[in-house]
Design a protein with these regions (language model features):
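Periplasmic c-type cytochrome electron-transfer domains
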Residues: 69-522
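Sec-dependent bacterial lipoprotein signal peptides
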Residues: 1-14
Length: 522
């Protein structure tokens, strides 16, 4: 598989979903329904799913979720704080999938009449395969593009699948975060070469608006490493140029915010139906669709326009909450996996939950952990209080904040322990993508300071370590050749550290191998 251009994901804010489900692109809307149907895995549409009676803290008998391990064994779950569920707007997941891949929630882009001419200029990010099940002109564009009408003009815009339809074993999976996007360049430099014709073509107004936004975003969203996502920078930059009450765009910044390179690893959508708070730091509370809708902020220039998008976004959220993790496609040693389940229950389930043959019988404790317990890079957890409190204030006073609250300090800055369904497919790991495989998540002493992926072929998967094949390096960005720098993950850089989650360090190699085998069954 070719790496897709750094241009691609910036056309859609990565806020389009904190987590969700794994649906092969072979799925039609009927398949979307069968993955959870109108009821979804939590029961009645929009109802919070069962979490097995998670306790208000991570300790005590109620924290066992029906197993003997987590309750009987002291562990880090004792320090977790339960985040309670809140009602989600009801929606139709079948209609939601249709809206996700056909509606124009990004209202600026490239005129349909110019899209064919744009491909040679825009390169790899326009050569994705078509999305099965779409018809008409949408069957002629890549899976992460949508042809739609704005004010009578046909334009082509990117959709949420730009960041949320990764590849695994050669198969496109809707809901899997992308791990091969290249955001290491300033996209505005490329887009400045795009010729705008003098003749009147429907959609030129939307294209001009799109190009102007990219000039603002481009310099602020340059990442250091291929595969890391600039979701934090995109969100910060866009809201800094908007009036919080009217959503009107300003060419000048309205909020002074720090310029930081903060990497993010897009989480899978299949976690969404279990989580009571979205984002790695758990700051999105209430009905989650408000923060999901922030993905439309690229071109949403009025509250009326946001309300129109909101008219169908509950359906999109229902789809996100209905889909499920994919099944591990390779062989599994059943005996070793059974041994691993026992180790997992004693050492991991207190934070990450328990897993049954039926998703409805799973348990997930929804625990938020303080930084001094989890120990992972603190920048994202502290972003809303230390680095960008103005962003939180803007959001909570905006239209989006009337739907979803941002609470980065409730009750403290920290990180949620995520559900682990399909975790084997979601590398690299930790919230900033700093650890190449799960084996190293379970053994912090062996994590490389500098590393790079061997290649970007999704069919090349490390079945032993559960991650993408990588090479450890003896040097980082400071000593690398310019052409190689963007492929190196340098954990000495700000917000890129790979510390923390040392909870597997005490396991023996045999126990660790057994847990890895068990995770393949999830």
């Amino acid at each position: 598989m070719r790496r897709r251009s750094w241009v691609s994901g910036l056309l859609v804010l990565a806020g389009c979903g904190d987590a969700g489900g794994g649906v092969s692109t072979e799925a039609s809307t009927e398949a979307a329904a069968s993955s959870g149907g109108a009821s979804g895995p939590g029961g009645e549409s929009g109802a919070p799913p069962t979490t097995g009676g998670a306790p208000t803290s991570g300790s005590g008998e109620d924290g066992s979720s029906g197993s003997t391990g987590p309750a009987a064994t002291p562990g880090p779950w004792e320090f977790g704080v339960f985040i309670p569920p809140e009602p989600q707007a009801p929606g139709d997941p079948v209609k939601g999938y249709e809206a996700l891949v056909t509606r124009g929630y990004i209202t600026c882009g490239i005129p349909w009449l110019l899209f064919g001419l744009a491909k040679p200029l825009l390169g790899p990010y326009t050569d994705g395969e078509a999305l099965p099940g779409r018809s008409g002109k949408n069957a002629q564009v890549p899976y992460n593009w949508t042809v739609h009408e704005v004010d009578g003009a046909e334009i082509v815009s990117q959709n949420c699948l730009t960041c949320h339809a990764g590849s695994f074993n050669g198969q496109r999976i809707v809901g899997l975060g992308t791990a091969d996007e290249d955001f290491t360049g300033d996209m505005s430099a490329l887009l400045n070469t795009f010729p705008i014709p003098d003749i009147p073509i429907p959609g030129l107004e939307q294209m001009t608006r799109f190009l102007n936004r990219m000039k603002v975003l481009g310099p602020m969203t340059v990442m250091r490493t291929v595969g890391t996502n600039p979701a934090e920078a995109v969100a910060i930059t866009l809201v800094a140029h908007r009036d919080r009450h009217t959503l009107a765009w300003s060419e000048e910044k309205l909020i002074d915010l720090p310029e930081m390179v903060v990497p993010s690893d897009p989480p899978p959508w299949w976690r969404a139906h279990k989580k009571n708070a979205l984002f790695y730091n758990g700051m999105a509370r209430g009905d989650h669709r408000g923060t999901m809708m922030l993905a439309t902020a690229l071109c949403t220039d009025s509250v009326a326009e946001a309300q129109q998008i909101d008219s169908y976004f509950a359906d999109i959220q229902a789809f996100v909450r209905s889909v499920q993790a994919p099944k591990y496609p390779f062989a599994i040693d059943a005996g070793l996996a059974a041994q691993g389940e026992a180790v997992f229950v004693d050492n991991c389930a207190g934070c990450h939950g328990t897993y049954a043959a039926n998703d409805v019988d799973d348990t997930y404790p929804n625990l938020l952990f303080p930084l001094d317990v989890i120990g992972t890079d603190a920048v994202v957890a502290e972003g809303g209080t230390k680095y960008a409190p103005a962003l939180v204030d803007w959001y909570n006073e905006s239209f989006y904040g009337s739907i979803t609250r941002m609470e980065p300090n409730n009750p403290f800055p920290g990180y949620m322990a995520p559900p682990l369904d399909g975790v084997w497919a979601t590398g690299p790991f930790l919230h900033n993508g700093s650890v190449p495989n799960i084996e190293l998540v379970l053994d912090s002493t062996k994590r490389p300071k500098f590393w790079r992926r061997v290649d970007y072929d999704s069919a090349h998967f490390d079945q032993a370590g559960l991650g993408w094949p990588f090479a450890e390096l003896m040097y980082g960005h400071a000593d690398a050749e310019d052409a190689e720098k963007k492929f190196i993950y340098d954990t000495t850089q700000f917000a890129h550290t790979n510390t923390g989650h040392t909870f597997g360090d005490h396991l023996t190699p045999a126990e660790r191998a057994a847990v890895l085998e068990y995770l393949k069954t999830l």
